[in-house]
């Protein structure tokens, strides 16, 4: 008989006895021919199961799911108790139109001052153009949406000649973009723009439905089996505000990776260093924003897929509370860890896009009973209106578990500035069972994904998937029903730990990632790669927000010694997006000057 352990209930665990254990995931790093051979072995009937069982045992998953008694009941999706109202916020209605919510959001921002952007000294420092810069330029007749569209199209059409290629987009229709831009230009000529998003270019990740494009999820074949009949719920809201939908962004195939590697369409390069990954899976969304081609994009986040590429590309990425945005019309619809959220070149722009797309589905309103959406009051340029004296939870040993001290040092510098400038208090916390959380997340995201795609795989489409997706699926197939139930018992247990932490702090702060953008191995471009250590480093801090459904944001806080961006993650209580956004605004003001990426297009330069 094998040995087993019995966990105490979470309420009985003495946190003073918890010891931090650095993650050391074990698996070979493979690319090229060796990777192809490894995948073929994984999929072989007998030897494949032996390899998978060995990897799971060697990385502690067998012990967690087969040799542990977990006393908590399962929680199959995030469940939140009712929350205390956020302080000094503006409450908006779930049923308000996106246009009305945008008007409310604009009133929460500092008054627009063209001298700080469009009329600022162009050589003093680099800056990204914001949504309100475009809106002002259109209203002032400095340019038109059609002129901007033609400039963007000319750049996109040159992508195929870039060395190395920069495939930001999977689907792009120049005629469709021109059609939208002409309609927006007419509205401005008639003095009737719909909203501040009228004429603003937004890119949509390829797992979110957006007419007239098919949705492939980064595959080459999914459109053959899944047709797109209408816009997704979030895209419909953006379209109703006058946004110009640029196309479908590249992504790590089916969201099954954190680097952004995609051998089907080419791997998107990091605008700060084209030899490096963007992070994923919302790789194209992050890169096209970081490169200046559009102010914002939509991504999905099931395991850091908005926050990781945002951090690695030096932009802002918001992961909303589970259920805050309607997932209808996305490949993630029906999942228990995924959300749709904005990626933007500034906190302000992420806030505006969030204001447009928020709104729970009718099912989530009934089941989750979300608190009313709230906006922070960002009425000063230093964010002081929005944060007050927040308590910032920091688990120091975890916070410092990064590949380079540059990351923890830059994040620590910002925490000190928040304390000195805004009176925030850093509170030491303990986050138990991080290894168990990683294991529970793998099953919670992997099993539903595999289940939704199994009919296609059984029909022969598995061979059309990339090798890294096939690696993930081979592991997911090994999980049993009892493994899945055990993971959901861990979800309830981990929820109790975190809700108790939030009794003593307002947010939990960490670096967004445990490393900056990794180098792309040349052999990985054709057939992908498997590198569990890179995956572990990139996902180290992001999982609680997905497994437990909390809101979280990545905001840039500086650069490492190689000039690569570093992100700070702020994770809040359920439904507390206003707190997270308000603190992120203060961080943005305190962070060092933004560096111009190596790949950047100055779309709105009217000089």
From Swiss-Prot:
InterPro entries: Amidase (IPR000120), Amidase_CS (IPR020556), Amidase_dom (IPR023631), AS_sf (IPR036928). Coiled coil: none annotated. The keyword Membrane applies. Disruption phenotype: No visible phenotype under normal growth conditions. Enhanced sensitivity to inhibition of seedling growth induced by exogenous N-acylethanolamine. Expressed in roots, leaves and flowers. Expressed in seedlings, flowers, roots, siliques, seeds and leaves. Its EC number is 3.5.1.99. The active site is at 205 (charge relay system), 281 (charge relay system), 305 (acyl-ester intermediate). GO terms for cellular component: endoplasmic reticulum; endoplasmic reticulum membrane; Golgi apparatus; plant-type vacuole; plasma membrane; plastid. Its main location: endoplasmic reticulum. Inhibited by methyl arachidonyl fluorophosphonate (MAFP). It is an enzyme of class 3 (hydrolase). It catalyses: N-(5Z,8Z,11Z,14Z-eicosatetraenoyl)-ethanolamine + H2O = ethanolamine + (5Z,8Z,11Z,14Z)-eicosatetraenoate; N-(9Z,12Z-octadecadienoyl)-ethanolamine + H2O = ethanolamine + (9Z,12Z)-octadecadienoate; N-hexadecanoylethanolamine + H2O = ethanolamine + hexadecanoate; N-tetradecanoylethanolamine + H2O = tetradecanoate + ethanolamine. The keyword Membrane applies. Pfam families: Amidase. GO terms for molecular function: fatty acid amide hydrolase activity; N-(long-chain-acyl)ethanolamine deacylase activity. Substrate binds at residues 302-305. PROSITE patterns: AMIDASES. GO terms for biological process: defense response to bacterium; lipid catabolic process; N-acylethanolamine metabolic process. Keywords: Cell membrane, Endoplasmic reticulum, Hydrolase, Lipid degradation, Lipid metabolism, Membrane. It is found in: Endoplasmic reticulum membrane; Cell membrane. Catalyzes the hydrolysis of bioactive endogenous fatty acid amides to their corresponding acids. The hydrolysis of endogenous amidated lipids terminates their participation as lipid mediators in various signaling systems. Converts a wide range of N-acylethanolamines (NAEs) to their corresponding free fatty acids and ethanolamine. Can use oleamide as substrate, but not indole-3-acetamide, 1-naphtalene-acetamide, nicotinic acid amide or L-asparagine. Can use 2-arachidonylglycerol as substrate. Participates in the regulation of plant growth. Forms homodimers. Belongs to the amidase family. Plants overexpressing FAAH exhibit accelerated seedling growth. Plants overexpressing FAAH exhibit enhanced susceptibility to the bacterial pathogen Pseudomons syringae pv tomato. Plants overexpressing FAAH exhibit enhanced sensitivity to abscisic acid (ABA). Plants overexpressing FAAH exhibit early flowering. This is Fatty acid amide hydrolase. The lineage of its organism: Eukaryota, Viridiplantae, Streptophyta, Embryophyta, Tracheophyta. The gene is FAAH.
């Amino acid at each position: 008989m094998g040995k087993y352990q019995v966990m105490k209930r979470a309420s009985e665990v003495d946190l003073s006895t918890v010891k931090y254990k650095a993650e050391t995931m074990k698996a070979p790093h493979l690319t090229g021919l060796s990777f192809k051979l490894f995948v073929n072995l994984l999929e072989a009937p007998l030897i494949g199961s032996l390899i998978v069982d060995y990897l799971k045992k060697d990385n502690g998953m067998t012990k967690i799911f087969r040799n542990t008694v977990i006393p908590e009941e399962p929680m199959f999706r995030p469940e939140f108790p009712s929350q205390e109202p956020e302080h000094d916020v503006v409450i908006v209605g779930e049923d308000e139109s996106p246009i009305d919510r945008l008007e409310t959001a604009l009133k929460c921002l500092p008054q627009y001052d063209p001298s700080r952007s469009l009329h600022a000294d162009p050589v003093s420092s680099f800056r990204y153009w914001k949504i309100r810069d475009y809106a002002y330029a259109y209203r002032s007749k400095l340019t038109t949406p059609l002129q901007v569209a033609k400039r963007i199209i000319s750049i996109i059409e040159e992508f195929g000649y870039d060395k190395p290629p920069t495939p930001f987009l999977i689907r792009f229709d120049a005629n469709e973009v021109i059609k939208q831009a002409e309609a927006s230009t007419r509205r401005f000529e008639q003095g009737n723009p719909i909203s501040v998003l009228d004429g603003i270019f937004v890119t949509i990740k390829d797992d979110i439905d957006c007419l007239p494009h098919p949705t492939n999820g980064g595959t080459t074949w999914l459109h053959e089996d899944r047709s797109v009949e209408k816009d997704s719920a979030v895209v419909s809201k953006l379209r109703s505000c006058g946004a110009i939908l640029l196309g479908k962004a590249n992504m790590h195939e089916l969201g099954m990776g954190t680097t952004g590697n995609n051998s089907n369409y080419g791997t998107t390069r990091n605008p700060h260093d084209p030899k490096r990954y963007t992070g994923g899976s919302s790789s194209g969304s992050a890169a096209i924003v970081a490169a200046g081609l559009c102010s914002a994009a939509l991504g999905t986040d099931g395991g850091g897929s908005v926050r990781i590429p945002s951090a690695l590309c030096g932009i802002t990425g918001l992961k909303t509370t589970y259920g805050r945005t309607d997932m209808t019309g996305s490949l993630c619809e029906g999942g228990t860890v995924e959300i749709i959220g904005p990626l933007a070149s500034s906190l302000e722009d992420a806030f505006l896009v969030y204001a447009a797309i928020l709104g729970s589905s009718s099912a989530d309103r009934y089941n989750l009973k979300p608190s009313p959406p709230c906006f922070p009051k960002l009425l000063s340029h230093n964010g002081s209106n929005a944060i007050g004296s927040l308590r910032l939870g920091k688990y120091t040993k975890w916070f410092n578990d990064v590949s380079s001290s540059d990351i923890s040092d830059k994040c620590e510098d910002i925490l000190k500035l928040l304390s000195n400038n805004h009176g925030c208090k850093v509170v030491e916390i303990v986050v138990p069972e991080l290894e168990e959380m990683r294991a529970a997340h793998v099953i919670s995201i992997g099993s539903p994904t595999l289940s939704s795609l199994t009919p296609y795989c059984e029909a022969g489409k598995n061979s059309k998937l990339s090798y890294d997706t096939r690696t993930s699926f081979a592991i997911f197939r090994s999980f049993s029903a009892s493994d899945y139930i055990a993971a959901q018992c861990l979800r309830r247990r981990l929820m109790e730990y975190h809700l108790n932490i939030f009794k003593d702090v307002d947010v939990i702060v960490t670096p967004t990632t445990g490393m900056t953008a990794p180098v792309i191995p040349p052999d990985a471009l054709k057939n992908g790669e498997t590198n569990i250590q890179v995956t572990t480093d990139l996902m180290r801090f992001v999982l609680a927000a997905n497994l437990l459904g909390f809101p979280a944001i990545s905001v840039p806080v500086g650069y490492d010694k190689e000039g690569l961006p570093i992100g700070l993650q702020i994770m809040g209580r359920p439904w507390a997006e206003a707190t997270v956004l308000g603190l992120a605004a203060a961080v943005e003001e305190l962070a060092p000057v933004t560096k111009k990426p190596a790949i950047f297009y100055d779309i709105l330069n009217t000089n």
